[in-house]
Amino acid sequence: MAAPSGVPPLRVLEELGIGLSPTGEVTEAVTSEGAYYLEQVTITETSEDECEYEEIPDDNFSIPEGEEDLEKAIHIIGEQARDIHILEQQTILPARNVMQEAIEDFLCNFLIKMGMTRTLDCFQAEWYELIQKKGSDFKGLGNVPDVYSQVMLLETENKNLKKELKHFKQAAEKAKEDLLRTQKERDFHRMHHKRIVQEKNKLIADLKGLKLHYASYEPTIRVLHEKHHALLKEKMLTSLERDRAVGKISGLQATLKNIDMGHIQVPVIKGSYESASITRESGDRAGHSCEKENSSEGPTQKSLREAREEVGYKSKLKNEKKDSEFPVDMQPDPNVTSCTENVSAAKFDYKLNNIFRLHELPVSCIVMHPCRDYLISCSEDRLWKMVGLPQGNVLLTGSGHTDWLSGCCFHPSGSKLATSSGDSTIKLWDLNKGECTLTLEGHNHAVWSCTWHSCGDFVASASLDMTSKIWDVNSERCRYTLYGHTDSVNSIEFFPFSNILLTASADKTLSVWDARTGKCEQSLYGHMHSVNDATFTPRGHIIASCDARGVTKLWDFRKLIPIVSIDVGPSSGNEVNFDQSGRVLAQASANGIIHLLDLKSGQIHKLVGHESEVHSVVFSHLGENLYSGGSDGTIRLWI
């Protein structure tokens, strides 16, 4: 490498770590990068034929003009090669050791900086005197540390400490959360353990009580077993006596039949029993001789005559009253349905307008007259009342049931009324006369609901005895008893203008029946609680039902599958009714609220005005008014 211009060669050698001895010889200088040597080379002259020449590009070096000789060219090439070799190697710079400033130098520099020359002179004089006197005692005083380095070290240490502090805080928070969670789990398991122990102790106590209870039943069971055997013996004896009595009755009936036909002559008693003679006639009734007018009628003859008269009377009544026939093809009566032709649009913004206080006890059912603006209300006070609308004037009051009334239904013509009661009867009333015309008996428990067939010849009833009955109004007898429900039948309704019946039961099911055969055609499952009421839309394509948990379900009557379920509970839904358009469904709830469901949009509107339970709800003919009956004995008008 060529030395820069203006720099002495010795200086360049010193920078490279190479020096010369006083005699001019080259000396070796060892640096951190290694040893460098300077050798003297003598180039001998050789023939040009023996040398191999290498072309050197002109761009790599430059020789000033006038100094172009072989020695300089070789020197420059060698320097260039060394430079390339040095650049290819990884240069390791020596570590820089910064010497800290001595204390006395720091003080001197501080005094000079502040311009305190006199103080500096005094300090230096006194300091050097001390050094001369004590010598090496001041060598261990140390140096002044570098403030900036110390600050950086402290800052770095501070940052590290802050990071560690943050890490420890996070770990502490996590440990705290784990501790709280563990404590909660411990408390939960402790409480659960205590509860299990209490339940265990309770079950042990109950088990001991049951063992004692069942032990006390053993003597009773033994006594009942003995009674059972005794009753079986009595039953066998009773069966024998019954068979004997049936034989006697059969003989008496045969005797009566023969007497009626004139084949047997009634004996005339003369004196003792042995003198009585029975003469069999072979002719007709004209040859029958009997001295009845000359002898007194005995008790046996009197009983036979009364039995014959009773049987004849019943057979005569039976022949006079014939059973009605179920219609085969029915169409809506235009005279009955004419009042519902002009139905207004659906309405939801009803407001409480009037309160009719009609009964002293809760209202159980309200129904609208098929055509007129009349309303019938039934109550637990054993009365039903006909009310004129919209004034609420009582037009007619009916009494005759011996227990609370549960429901009522108008005859399709509107001239008759059927009522069901807790006295297990159904009564038919003539509204023109205001009196009961027929009482239907046959249920074993309270009757919850009744409904008229569209032809007006049949009435169906639902009872607590888990059965429903179809009554023939003309023959005044039960045509069919519908068995199938496993709990109380709460509601019953005829499908409009058909022979199909719909029942709702406390066994959480709905059933569809054929009234002509009395058989169940289909059962609908879906409710989780007792079904209180079920009804059809005016068109008859949808069934609505509500249960004791406030759940209302809509069913497709054609497919007999559920469409939608609306939960407005947990209060019980007591009754559901459609308006004449079939778009609005009203539900009477036990919490005093009337829920109106829009079947088109699915929205639910609430009517609040009752102070207690709502038992029944019904729309007016055109849907402009709504009537509701509550447990406070009132009927409320909503317009």
UniProtKB/Swiss-Prot annotation:
Compartments it resides in: Cytoplasm; Cytoplasm, Cytoskeleton, Cilium axoneme; Cytoplasm, Cytoskeleton, Flagellum axoneme; Cell projection, Cilium, Flagellum
CDD domains reported for this sequence: WD40 (cd00200)
Protein species of origin: Mus musculus
Region (Disordered): 280-333
InterPro entries for this protein: G-protein_beta_WD-40_rep (IPR020472), WD-F-box_domain-protein (IPR050995), WD40/YVTN_repeat-like_dom_sf (IPR015943), WD40_repeat_CS (IPR019775), WD40_repeat_dom_sf (IPR036322), WD40_rpt (IPR001680)
Coiled coil spans: 146-218
Pfam entry (one): WD40
Name of the protein in its database record: Sperm-associated antigen 16 protein
